[in-house]
């Protein structure tokens, strides 16, 4: 088959291979048309999405939850070939601690491309897959994505895959009937699946595949987790298929151009890609690998989901102790068995504060480690609080849209106050803002230092003024008044000259002060001390101006008179 006939040019193949890997790229190019023949032939479990969400959105007591959960469901092509196709899935973004682990485990940014380039390439790949697999431009979800992370591209691109029995990770798992547990898929040299490259780029280290009679459950985590047989048995029991009545295969007359159904999802309308395929954002909880070691002493991870009332019979088939009211079921992934209690009154009661009146009796399932918790009301998930009178909070899609709108508004506000912007992208704007803030901080520091210096000078000046104020003595003599000003030598303007005279070993005989218009005259009469070197005019001037002694000092002006016995 000529690849160009399928709408794949050389540039498309290069971009898809760089983002998804060569194995995934080759598979998608070869099957982008043949998938039109896939139809769901087995009934689906109405609670499948809730069960998958319980594994991802409900952390256990150790704050652990899986990063993604995908159920590959048994499907059949029109030619009668049995394959495993996308049944449903749930995924979330790594939290801060997990994100740091992803960076240390595997970093594809070292391949030479900038993050913005990777974003454009991922969006382009999703748009290409959407069109080739029968989606229309009106419902192209990739167009509305502002940012596509490695986790999102891994999860969203996975929905276009299917596996023949015995091929790929899920296909081999289903054919053998044995589970697969990879504790370090990132550093593994072998490719467990066509999607290995995408899983590694998303930093997925632990990959678990559990076969059931309806398909294969695939779980993934960025943590490296040791194998837990109790977990395998628990999820195997929970995901047993309830509906075994085959569904009639759609006839050829229902094919009205393009793809009618792909992996059990109607792609002919505007709801080809349901909102449940969105990737959840970061959880606030923290988990450490040491917490996982609790699986050896009945402290394994716990997850919950809210099944419908008709799930009661299924849970009873695996020895689940249930109540006829609405309830919430949790899976306790414990390594060893836990004794079951058939009497709800003997179940352990969770302690509640005085402000919480809701009681939740718990019963345990022996061996499988499944916990049933009775709830009168379904608890709300963490997230945005209800607003405008809504009883339920916003779904993750609308909440994420509003979050991004607020974030964009703040970027616009930031752009308006930063004077010099190098580029218009957000990363450059943040860099310019950081530089501008640092520049302002430097200016503030300089101004603070100047203010402190000015305050110190004023304080010293005021201290000198107060402490060393001259003493004024006034005496009246006949018609004259004698004003005598007495001040310390250190604070007197002529103190430097007098000190220079003392250093020159001369004695001050007399000092006079006179005023002529705007000029003040200081007259000093000095005398050389006995035994000292002869005093010359040059020596005396050098003593008065020590800082300019190396050069020719200015001669005293007419306003300065120096006389003495030389």
Curated annotation (Swiss-Prot):
Family matches, as InterPro entries: AIB/MYC-like, bHLH_dom, HLH_DNA-bd_sf, MYC/MYB_N
User: Any stretches that span the bilayer, and where are they?
Assistant: none
GO MF, one term, reads: DNA-binding transcription factor activity
Q: Where is the composition biased (Polar residues)?
A: 338-350
Q: Where is the signal peptide?
A: none
Query: How is this protein annotated for GO cellular component?
Result: nucleus
Keywords, A to Z, come to: Abscisic acid signaling pathway, Activator, DNA-binding, Nucleus, Transcription, Transcription regulation
> Which SMART domains does the record associate with it?
HLH
In which compartments does the protein localize? Nucleus
The tissues in which it is expressed are: In seedlings, mainly expressed in root tips, cotyledons, hypocotyls, and leaves, as well as its guard cells. In adult plant, detectable in stems, flowers, and siliques.
UniProt protein name: Transcription factor ABA-INDUCIBLE bHLH-TYPE
Q: To which species is this protein native?
A: Arabidopsis thaliana (Mouse-ear cress)
